[in-house]
């Protein structure tokens, strides 16, 4: 049995990406999220190249009646806020489309939040971690950088 414990494995247990949602860490709360701004908002579903499917999808699924494009994407992460919003319709590293119901009323420059499935690799894609308490950024923490 592997009993290896190091600062990386302990750190992952502390920030708790979804891959660490285990019985042993049930008492820990997730502490690592990706915040991404909304770039575009459409009050109808717009699917590139599939305009014929737009209206039937909106009628069939009320969660496909509004469309947001978020910055970036293709991250190893799951959408967590706003609550009940699904992962992107398709993955893109540039802009990712997020379909929602009309009850989700966000605007351009608001943020959506994702919870990473892993920690070390995802952290390499961003700058410093921002420590937040309440609604205030209280500190910045550097992350390890990949070296070659």
Predicted stretch roles:
Residues 1-148:
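Active-site anion/phosphate-binding pocket segments in diverse small-molecule metabolic enzymes
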């Amino acid at each position: 049995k592997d009993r290896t414990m190091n600062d990386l494995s302990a750190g992952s247990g502390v920030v708790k990406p979804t891959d660490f949602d285990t019985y042993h860490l049930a008492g820990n709360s997730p502490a690592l999220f990706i915040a991404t701004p909304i770039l575009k908002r459409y009050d109808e579903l717009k699917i590139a190249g599939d305009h014929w499917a737009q209206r039937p999808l909106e009628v069939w699924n009320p969660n496909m009646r509004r469309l947001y494009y978020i910055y970036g994407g293709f991250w190893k992460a799951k959408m967590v806020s706003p609550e009940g919003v699904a992962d992107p319709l398709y993955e893109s590293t540039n802009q990712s489309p997020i379909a929602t119901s009309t009850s989700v009323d966000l605007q351009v420059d608001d943020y959506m939040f994702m919870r990473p499935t892993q920690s070390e690799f995802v952290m390499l894609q961003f700058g410093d971690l921002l420590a937040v308490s309440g609604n205030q950024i209280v500190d910045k923490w550097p992350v390890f950088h990949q070296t070659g």
